[in-house]
From Swiss-Prot:
Residues 379-420, 577-640 are annotated as: Disordered. InterPro entries: Fxna-like_M28_dom (IPR048024), M28_fam (IPR045175), Peptidase_M28 (IPR007484), PFF1_C (IPR053975), PFF1_TM (IPR053976). Glycans are attached at residues 107, 213, 677, 761, 961. It comes from Coprinopsis cinerea (strain Okayama-7 / 130 / ATCC MYA-4618 / FGSC 9003) (Inky cap fungus). This is Vacuolar membrane protease. Its main location: membrane. Residues 406-419 have a biased composition (Polar residues). The active site is at residue 196. The lineage of its organism: Eukaryota, Fungi, Dikarya, Basidiomycota, Agaricomycotina. Residues 588-606 have a biased composition (Low complexity).
């Protein structure tokens, strides 16, 4: 008996064991998620993992590549390209199976629904022949089986590009060296492309190259943040994801990081970012070719943490999150996945189908076909039975179902009237059903749903409080915000359920708590079944894989509910068997002692009646003695201070319902917070982020609901204190820091007159009297943008106008005149007779020259030449304003026709043509055809718009190679002012491809 009491105090369904076990599960689950999210350490020198790699060389490569900003339209870009070309030439030298192509031939035109592009590629390509392929055979596209590895070496104009995409390029250099010395089965093609930051131009240029026809699978390396662990951003299907496992054990990725939630977010527009993945797969195609299926299967692997430093000066080697460990993590993942892609197991038998993938904390990645999830969900058990509140919840003295309780019906006394007793029993039960009892039953039945409604309502109210008071507090303290939501959810859920199921006055009534737990489990089962039904519909219609957690949640709840339903039956049967054994022992004991009892003296009998019998009661036990013994036992039981509780059953239920959900939801929560908390400055809605955090916090608490009546009340007070303390702190704290800065987007525009651009005389010199109109634009979230402007001296004495941004939803653009901070394009003026630009003023500096000639009634030729730039544009007024739409364009000297899958939209036309050249100061000749909308005459409408050129170079980011004299260095003083005077909690990024855009209007006459 003592052993049973000790075991019950430790393992019984009591307050302290339940609280301790659940608290331990949460601590272990959260700790495992945080530990698995840490960057792996770099292997020690001489490790087999490092064989074939040189991390010191990789670090030096990164320092060369990310020394300064190097966008496509910069001279620093040429320097990076030259460095990479020399490195690749050294690797390929003396190896016949390694082929290097310095691609300066791939030109092409392609269009999106809104704009058209002409681009001249400068990609660096490497082909390493596979052992199973014939290098002299040009394989048709239909049977192409090579693997494409891709990263871009250009950066944005405001960042050195350590993670975007310097680490990706350095990783490819290491892979080229590794695969050159360790040939794989398939052919590997590496596209170190240029122009990705200007809307994926380098990937499009690769499609123009013959080697593009040799690939069927790809691995794209990207950086959408500022370091940390690279994650599997998205995948076309499970087929390429299996590359994580199709590798020898010693090369396998030991710490994979993947979750299908990113792929779903990309597909539905929640992630405002684009990578070469969309070009290689062809998912962004339009027109007739859009229905042709995927061009290639593949994976997108990228960094995602620290987005506030993304595309800013803090994306540099010195500020990368994780430093060299982050670089090694990317190399390790790319090597493991690359080997798997190049050496697949039975690739011909593998089918391309969408799937579910996520990495379990501290374990390898898990794959699950969406079809299997859908099939399982469709075949899941039916909805649970209607929950019922056991009578013992209202009558604590009931003994039915309690271990050891007798189930024998009471014996009728001699001469009793059964019918009369039955009628009196029915009337007694009817009278006992009072309004109070009915209300108590309804309250207990509805308590879970009331708790859920209260919790959801309070979570929504808290989200409103954050959005209204301090919406950016999640920007730098996401886990504090999560803790605030979690504490409130736990407080409200537990408080309501403990009020519905208070502590029983008879603490040893085990069946009370067990059946209360089962009641809540049944309601939770119903909720999970509804969620499973909705997720099945979404999976079937939209192929949403992120609902895998609902399936896991439902399975755990279902199993725990089955245990709770079977427990009373099994316990009752065991109690009946135990009672029968006791009865047999009692009869045997009574028979053996009958002779001695009859010979006992009266005094002895009196003594025996005074001492309670230790034998169990039976049908032969004297009635009065049994009553006295029972009363004594009840008095002793009621005097006990120890809490009773069933052993074993509840532990299995806790392990089935709590750990799987907490670990999976905890991992999703960590990814969501790290990836989305700093997207507010990109224009994302604060409501969506806070409501999503509230939903995840509620899901973390829901598994505890069935056991909450047994949790220690101290946890309620603790959660209330945590909620109040952290919420007040988060509402008043300043949300931005140097590590998590507020991001603003910069651009300066120069509006030129027609005579500044179009030829006026033979020399091309056209001097204006009033000069250009120069405006500085700063774009950002309106909540803090206007607090930033006073830091800039040029804005203090000017009229500032602000309006919603035309493209970036949720952001605002403020403008002011800044002629005193006029930009200078740099280089030599090809149209001027002046010996030096130092002799000229800012009002007569030439930016570009252009000419427009009408060649037919609906055709014109544009000639554009920019000064010290490789990027110009043609803007056309929308059809609603001009009455015409541009339906065709051809650039002289470029490839004929449009890239397959990217034609001009003949219904809406193009409103912009972006021109990119690999040579400086090139003069583009562009033929344009237009149409008038249906129902208008040929003479109606007039093609008009703007001609513009872009510049991205400024003094603090220049390459000091002596190519420019002091009077010919490009300058953007307004940007230098922003970089100098803005506080440390503000970071500057580009607003468009050009930091400076000079434009002049045109009209085709």
């Amino acid at each position: 008996m003592a052993k049973e009491t000790t075991a019950r105090s430790i393992l019984g369904y009591q307050t302290l064991p339940t609280t301790a076990l659940i608290a331990l599960i949460y601590v272990v689950a959260f700790f495992s998620v945080l530990v698995s999210d840490q960057l792996p350490s770099i292997p020690h020198p001489g490790s087999k993992k490092l064989k074939g790699f040189d991390l010191d060389l990789a670090r030096r490569d990164l320092e060369h590549i990310a020394a300064r900003p190097h966008p496509y339209n910069s001279h620093a870009n040429d320097a990076v390209r030259e460095y990479l070309l020399n490195r690749l030439d050294d690797i390929a030298w003396g190896k016949d199976h390694v082929h290097l192509d310095n691609d300066l031939r791939s030109n092409g035109s392609w269009a999106s629904p809104k704009y058209g592009v002409y681009f001249e590629g400068t990609n660096l390509l490497v082909k390493i022949d596979g052992t199973d392929d014939d290098p002299h055979t040009q394989i048709p596209r239909g049977v192409a089986d090579g693997v494409l590895f891709s990263a871009h070496y250009d950066s944005v104009s405001t960042a050195a590009g350590a993670t975007d995409d310097g680490m990706g390029v350095v990783t490819l250099l290491q892979l080229i060296q590794y695969f050159a010395e360790n040939r794989q089965r398939k052919t590997a093609i590496f596209n170190i492309n240029n122009g990705e930051e200007d809307w994926l131009n380098g990937a499009h240029a690769f499609l123009q190259h013959p080697w593009a026809n040799l690939t069927s699978t790809f691995l794209n390396l990207e950086g959408a943040a500022s370091g940390g662990r690279p994650i599997l951003f998205r995948s076309t299907s499970l087929k390429p994801v299996k590359a994580y496992d199709d590798v020898p054990h010693k090369l396998r990725v030991r710490h994979p990081h993947a979750n299908v939630i990113f792929s779903d977010a990309f597909a539905r527009g929640f992630v405002r970012s684009g990578t070469d993945y969309s070009v290689y797969t062809g998912i962004d195609r339009h027109g007739p070719a859009a229905e042709g299926g995927l061009l290639r299967e593949g994976l997108d692997i990228a960094f995602y943490k620290g987005r506030s430093r993304y595309h800013t000066r803090w994306d540099a080697p010195a500020y990368t999150e994780g430093g060299e460990r982050s670089l090694w993590s990317m190399i390790d993942v790319a090597r493991g996945v690359g080997v798997g892609l190049l050496n697949p197991e039975d690739s011909a038998k593998q089918k391309s189908k969408p799937g579910v993938y996520f990495d379990r904390p501290v374990v390898l990645a898990l794959l699950w076909a969406i079809g299997a999830v859908l099939k399982h969900n469709a075949g899941s058990p039916p909805p649970p039975p209607k929950p019922t509140v056991p009578h013992s919840a209202n009558n604590a003295s009931a003994g039915t179902g309690r271990p050891g309780a007798s189930t024998r019906q009471p014996t009728r006394s001699f001469g009793s009237n059964e019918d009369a007793n039955s009628e009196r029993g029915i009337l007694a039960r009817i009278k006992s059903v009072s309004v109070k009892n009915v209300l108590i039953t309804v309250w207990k039945q509805a308590s879970f749903w009331i708790a859920l409604i209260v919790t959801v309502g309070l979570q929504a109210l808290l989200a409103w409080g954050y959005v209204a008071i301090n919406p950016f507090t999640i920007y730098s303290r996401p886990y504090f915000v999560l803790l605030s939501f979690f504490a409130l959810s736990f407080f409200s859920m537990t408080l309501v359920l403990q009020a519905a199921f208070p502590s029983s006055p008879v603490k040893h009534a085990i069946e009370v708590r067990e059946q209360e737990k089962t009641t809540i489990l049944l309601h939770l089962h119903l909720l999970s079944w509804i969620a499973l039904l909705l997720s099945t519909i979404l999976i079937g219609k939209s192929q949403v894989g992120s609902f895998y957690v609902v399936t896991v949640w439902y399975l755990g709840i279902w199993a725990a509910t089955v245990i709770g339903t079977l427990q009373p039956i099994l316990v009752s049967k065991r109690a009946d068997d135990k009672g029968k054994r006791r009865a047999r022992r009692s009869r045997s004991a009574s028979t053996s002692s009958s002779s001695s009892s009859s010979s006992s003296s009266s005094s002895g009998s009196d003594t025996e009646t005074e001492r309670p019998s230790t034998q169990p009661a039976s049908e032969r036990t004297p009635l009065l003695f049994g009553r006295a013994n029972g009363a004594s036992n009840r008095r002793k039981t009621n005097s006990k201070s120890k809490e009773d509780g069933a052993i074993g059953w509840w532990i299995a239920q806790v392990l089935l319902t709590v750990p799987p959900v907490v670990m999976l939801v905890g991992q999703i929560t960590s990814i969501v917070l790290e990836a989305m908390n700093q997207t507010l400055t990109d224009g994302n809605s604060a409501w969506s982020i806070y409501l999503l955090t509230a939903l995840l916090a509620t899901m973390l608490v829901l598994p505890v609901a069935p056991f909450s009546p047994k949790l220690h009340r101290g946890l309620i007070f603790l959660s209330a204190a945590v909620f109040v303390g952290f919420t007040i702190y988060l509402w008043v704290v300043f949300p931005f820091t140097r590590q998590d800065p507020f991001k603003v987007f910069f651009q300066q525009t120069v509006s030129l007159d027609r005579e500044d651009v179009f030829p006026m005389n033979a020399t091309g010199n056209a001097v204006t009297t009033h000069g250009p109109k120069i405006v500085t634009e700063l774009t950002g979230n309106p909540a803090y943008l206007r607090r930033v402007l006073p830091y800039l001296p040029s804005s203090r004495e000017e009229d500032i106008t602000c309006s919603p941004h035309e493209v970036r939803t949720g952001l605002e653009t403020c403008r002011w005149k800044s002629n005193r901070l006029a930009p200078f394009p740099g280089g030599k003026d090809p149209w001027s007779t002046w010996d030096s630009d130092a002799q000229r003023t800012t009002t007569d500096v030439s930016f570009f020259k252009a000419d427009v000639t009408r060649t037919a009634w609906a055709s014109a030729r544009f000639i554009v030449q920019g000064r010290n730039t490789r990027n110009c544009r043609l803007y056309f007024d929308p059809p609603e304003k001009s009455g015409v739409r541009v339906v065709r364009y051809v650039v002289h000297g470029g490839a004929k026709g449009m890239q397959p899958g990217y034609p001009v939209d003949l219904v809406n036309g193009v409103q912009e043509i972006r021109l990119w050249s690999r040579t400086w100061g090139k003069a583009w000749e562009v033929d344009v055809d237009w149409e008038t909308p249906l129902g208008t005459g040929e003479d109606e409408g007039q093609l008009a718009g703007r001609i513009a050129c872009e510049w991205v170079e400024y003094q603090s980011a220049m390459v000091d190679n002596g190519s420019f004299g002091p009077d010919r260095q490009p300058k953007i003083p307004a940007l230098e002012e922003a970089l100098t005077f803005l506080p440390e909690w503000v970071a500057v990024s580009k607003a468009a491809d050009g930091l400076v855009e000079a434009s002049a209007p045109f009209t085709v006459v």
